[in-house]
Amino acid sequence: MNKRQSQLKFGNEGISLAVPKQSLQECSYMSNLITDRESTFLSYFVPSKDPKMLPVYRFMFQESADLKHCNHKMQAWRFPNEIEAFNDDGEEYSGQKLLNVLRKEDVYGMVVCVRWYGGQLLGPVRFQHITNTAKQSIDKYKSVLEEERKKQLLRTETGLLRQSSSRSSSLLDQRIRQITAKDKTVNLLRKTLNRPLLHEVDYHGKSLEILDMLLQSRNSMISSLRSELQEKNQKDKKKEVNKLEEKMTNAKEPNVNVPSMKASSAISVETPETIESEASVDHKEASKIIKDVEKEE
């Protein structure tokens, strides 16, 4: 099979035409014009991975009014599964050079270089114009892809930032609620111990790190105040017991003026059971306060 036959083989496989969804201008990327001694070169690149669209693209170039008066429409195409071929259209060796550009740039689709002949033979330099315009059209396609990739990356990053900001805002609100509840607990304990209360603070605008530190500080404060309240209750109870013991001791001493039976009947006598009962009441009140604190948390 000679070279000319190999160029035309793909176009003669009888693939049925599909309906194009875009015009030639919409589906292709065009290079800048190169003019040399009145000959003008222009290339188009149509990205595609579907070989069934090849006859459609070739027909679009064939019937384009903008290319009606050009002298050559050199073509090459490359698709997955090693489907590739070219057509010189009278400019010998040009199709192979276009196919080499597709391979080197590692893209799939069709590249077409058109030439308006200016009347002078250009020699080998014409191949530079052919390959340069072809590469330029592919570069434009890659540039658009890169821009789209950057936009997609930016959209993704923006979405992640929004999600992160939303999570961070939610966490900040949670910390503020926790610290506000802790402040109420601290003030309840301080009030019971006759201590000055914490001043009301607006925690909005503080960083998460600061809020975490404040939350840890409030937890330590509550633990310390609880211990102090329990210790105070124990001391109060012990004082009451000592007071009772002192009264019992004084009652046993001699020469104590004993009131008459009538008068003594009006005097309430404190017994160990009475003092214990009163201390128990105080202890229950302290326990209730601690339980209320735990509920506040």
From Swiss-Prot:
Basic and acidic residues: compositionally biased ranges: 228-250, 280-297
Quick check: keyword Phosphoprotein in the entry?
Answer: no
In this chain, the stretch annotated as Disordered covers: 228-297
Question: Per the UniProt entry, what are the Gene Ontology biological process annotations, in alphabetical order?
Answer: GCN2-mediated signaling; regulation of cytoplasmic translational initiation in response to stress
Residue ranges the record marks as coiled coil: 225-255
The GO cellular component terms are:
site of double-strand break
Enumerate the Gene3D superfamilies for this protein: Impact, N-terminal domain (3.30.230.30)
Is-annotated flag, keyword Protease? no
Protein origin, superkingdom: Eukaryota
Q: Which UniProt keywords apply?
A: Coiled coil
Q: Which InterPro entries match?
A: Impact (IPR023582), Impact_N (IPR001498), Impact_N_sf (IPR036956), Ribosomal_Su5_D2-typ_SF (IPR020568)
Any matching Pfam family = UPF0029
Similarity section: Belongs to the IMPACT family.
Q: Which PANTHER family match?
A: IMPACT FAMILY MEMBER C14C8.09C, IMPACT-RELATED
Q: Kindly provide the name given to this protein in its UniProt entry.
A: IMPACT family member C14C8.09c
From the broadest rank down, the organism's phylogenetic lineage runs: Eukaryota, Fungi, Dikarya, Ascomycota, Taphrinomycotina
